[in-house]
Amino acid sequence: LMESGVLTCRGFHCEVITDRTTPPQAPVRFHNLFFHVPTGNPGVTPTFPPGRSEFDEFRWWRPIDLISSWEANEIRLPPPIVTLARDLVEAIENEGDLQSACDALAANPPTGKHRFEYGPGVECVLIPTDTLPPATHTNCFILGERGGERVIVDPAAKDEEGFEELAFKIQEIYDDDSSIIATIFTHRHPDHIGDLQRISEIYQAPIWASSETLEAMTHSDSDRVLKEGDSFILDGPSGGISWDIIESPGHCPGQICLVGESGIVSADNCTLVGTILVPSGEGDMGAYISGLERIRDLRPKVLFPGHGPLIANPKRVLTEYIEHRKARHQKVLEAVKAGNSDISSIASAAYSDSPGAHPLLAQDQALSHLKELQRTGDVENDDSIYTEA
């Protein structure tokens, strides 16, 4: 309307200082523009707009103070705001003041790959993998501070695009004068373990993983078995960052999570994209549900999942997962009590509220529930015929 002359505006100045496109972790991506709008009135106070539940607080911040509070885990910021604030801090150092910094960014916006900083000392690289749709990537996390010790978690690269993404990040790490002290694999599923031979041509580091995961790959004497209660500290410019190991084997035997002050690297326990399967062959539904409850009880600030965007509201998401799995567990039991005895009819009854569920996946998940019901003595199995105990 303003371009057509229908509307006019005087005394208003606005400039785009950068833009960001959300990474390909979800079916829908967003292109965001960030503006600088000088008000000319230092007394203007930001007000909290009603109905905006995604925001926690509105206030003015100096960019350097914003980053400092975020790095101290005092506040949470979405990844685009972190890199924007860092760009502003650098531009202010170069230009002398905020207005000049914004003018410089508007004239020459930052280009190229942006770091995905999910939390202090937690970066993410998206590796394309053949994982469960609608997810298309596995999250490879880089732990530790720039200029300090780093750990690579789940480098799942198996094709040229994945190798290029990983190689770019590794070079960036070395350019920061960082050292890579280990590669950690959260579990042994193929969408988390990449081509180790090709990866070793990009960088070399000992492998840390659970005994079950190490048994699934070729490893050396320099590798380390991680188990419940273990921990490690990554030294960096601001001190040491500690990470603790907890076991969460429901989705996969030997799966581990990494617990730190910034949040929990939660592997394949929950996701905002699609669902998490508990395979009937090797999974454990009881351990999976209790693992979700344990992670929730740790009250993490953020979850860094194996697939999809970071989870900024862990308590709500984990509670939804727990309630959903327990409700499905009850539906499977009720299906058996109603006289359904074979896996096909049990799955059809238990998943009657989910007509879009793939029948083979529904049967596999129903079987996982049945195995747990057998373990607890609620169901009996006689040559794949299930009856109430």
PLM region spans:
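Active-site segment of metal-dependent pyrophosphate-handling enzymes
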Residues: 1-46
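Conserved beta-strand hairpin/beta-sheet module of binuclear metal-dependent hydrolase folds
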Residues: 122-172, 257-269
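Active-site HxH/HxHxD metal-binding segment of metal-dependent hydrolases
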Residues: 136, 157-242
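Residue-level signal for inorganic ion chemistry
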Residues: 143, 307, 332, 373
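C-terminal regulatory/interaction regions
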Residues: 334-389
